[in-house]
UniProtKB/Swiss-Prot annotation:
Source organism of the structure: Mus musculus (Mouse)
Residue span(s) of domain Protein kinase: 97-273
Protein name from the UniProt record: Serine/threonine-protein kinase RIO2
Record function comment: Serine/threonine-protein kinase involved in the final steps of cytoplasmic maturation of the 40S ribosomal subunit. Involved in export of the 40S pre-ribosome particles (pre-40S) from the nucleus to the cytoplasm. Its kinase activity is required for the release of NOB1, PNO1 and LTV1 from the late pre-40S and the processing of 18S-E pre-rRNA to the mature 18S rRNA. May regulate the timing of the metaphase-anaphase transition during mitotic progression, and its phosphorylation, may regulate this function.
Subunit structure: Associated with late 40S pre-ribosomal particles. Interacts with PLK1 (via its N-terminus).
Amino acid sequence: MGKVNVAKLRYMSRDDFRVLTAVEMGMKNHEIVPCSLIASIASLKHGGCNKILRELVKHKLIAWERTKTVQGYRLTNAGYDYLALKTLSSRQVVESVGNQMGVGKESDIYIVANEAGQQLALKLHRLGRTSFRNLKNKRDYHKHRHNVSWLYLSRLSAMKEFAYMKALYERKFPVPKPIDYNRHAVIMELINGYPLCQIHHVEDPASVYDEAMELIVKLGNHGLIHGDFNEFNLMLDKDDHITMIDFPQMVSTSHPNAEWYFDRDVKCIREFFMKRFSYESELYPTFSDIRKEDSLDVEVSASGYTKEMQADDELLHPVGPDDKITETEEDSDFTFSDEEMLEKAKVWRSELEKEADPADESGGSWCCSSTDSKQIKDGGLPEESAHVSSFEVTALSQAVEEMERQVLPHRSVTEFSEESRRTENDGQPGQRSPAGSEDCDDEPPHLIALSSVNREFRPFRDEESMSSVTRHRTRTLSVTSAGSALSCSTIPPELVKQKVKRQLTRQQKAAARRRLQKGEANVFTKQRRENMQNIKSSLEAASFWGD
């Protein structure tokens, strides 16, 4: 894990990066990627995958490993750096790479420049350089995976840091401006300052101390705790202002150990100022001083904020007083209307039984009295009475529907079919059954009334609607099928030729790919040759001793 040597980057071809990317893709589910898989993923046009692999091994971009069961290649940190730099250069973010500025336990910092000559900072994450025995317990990069690669963890760390940096920069926190990221590389603004650990004299230690403590509290108010807030992750410019760096290990204030992390950050700053600048203050923040203003931990998914906590937060939001009033009003209106409907239906049914004529009862139809109809026609009925009458008619129809639901389940299918046939016979003129017939006595009067009403509302269709053609049928009619009787095919012959040619080309490419994969997978041939050589040498030794 030395310095990045980008001198060979300009001489690498497209096929070299294709094979390097194939090794990276194979490492998603392989610790050691076999040669056959690399050849099939790369799918080089002219072959030669083994030759490129040997060149990449020579330049230490990949490494050859062989165990008792498998043998193949794995990606190194240098190869991962080349892939990230190639992508950033294609995006026109990085044009040149300069000197190394700093080395940390988890990252390397380099000076880079874009096409305009503006200097930026390149941070390459190097998780796994030092021993992290409890990494799975301290960081949540791996989620629920048991076996993870250090390259993959470095990529997750860079992605998380870029997300934090972007969110904090948009909220006016003193952090570098994020530019771009790819894989384990993060491009950010180059800060003109020095780390706080390298500074031995400050004009006003109290102001710097207050600014650091205010920054800790401000992070807590936004739902975040730095987790590693010390002199190594703070930079001081010429005006003695603090800039915060290196925060992929941030945790949420909802974390079970949030108070411990908060107190540790405060303790680190207090001890540093007391040792370096001989400054000690009795004023320092505590975890209870946090007043949450924003949920930045939810936005960037900080450690400790789970989906269960998010669901609990949604349940904890109380319903406003307006919502409660609306719900109670809706429930009360619905209950009152239902009771009133039933009462009105009972009253109206009793009145109909008293005032209805025998002929109307036998015929199964009901109507209003002559005086009421006359008043309605003349318009002499007041508005309130008209409204009440319309409401009562609606209530009666609803009551009739309720009675239908009670009667129909107890009737058999044959009875229902016989009733439908009798209803059809009743609908024909001159064939109406007498009032005292058995059919009418067996059937409830309201069912006969509904059947007569339904016959009055049958759909009406004129001649134009009967002769119209469905629209989607007209769209499928082609000119050749409608106007030509000589040809039965509706597909142009040119299109048929193109499809056949495309299919043949696809088959040829598939066959070439299979031959390429078979030719590249020469590891087994090498093993057979070694075994034959061992057998031959053992036989020669046996014949030499005369056995």
